[in-house]
Amino acid sequence: MDILGIILSALLTENFILVKFYGICPFMGVSKKIDTALGMGMAVTFVMALASAACFAVNLLLVVLGLEYMQTVLFILVIAALVQVVEMFLKKFVPALYKALGVFLPLITTNCAVLGVVLVNVAEGYNFLISIINGAAGGLGFTLAIVLFASMRERVDKSDCPECFKGYPLALIAAGLLALAFMGFSGLSIS
């Protein structure tokens, strides 16, 4: 698969949230406002790209040492360290976004979309450059999905609907419709 195919696949046909259902916790928790969703998406994109690069190197070392069974544990440790770096950066340089993301920023550590992209890179046997591209494109797909969903939620929250649908019930219906829309991309032949 060429680079453009990998990018389009990560953005649309294999979107981590709407197709693979990775990263649902921040998708539902941080998607009430577009600006917060965009900040979370950018942070996740940065961590996914960096984690793809760092975990590629870690995986090479594990293969040389014959310790492939330690992949998941070490990948989580690498991701946790990267999230701490992002958290320190945001706290120092973008304190408003740091406060807006709140508890969801440290939760990027356990965001399965970040771990998912690293494991996909290893499973597909991507080289260093393609791993970074797939990580960044996967993060941009995450950002696209969460920002689209945040814009839907902002409009839905202002609408007049029955009391029993307010909050998460209507948000889940909107998420389902968004996932259904992205299912339309599954017919694309990207090779």
Model segments located where?
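Helix-coil boundary and interhelical linker segments in multi-pass alpha-helical membrane proteins
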Residues: 1-5, 57-70, 119-132, 187-191
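Structural signature of hydrophobic alpha-helical transmembrane segments
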Residues: 3-18, 66-81, 133-145
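Juxtamembrane transmembrane-helix termini in multi-pass membrane transport proteins
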Residues: 6-43
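Generic transmembrane alpha-helix signature in multi-pass membrane proteins
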Residues: 21-29, 88-93, 104-107, 112-125
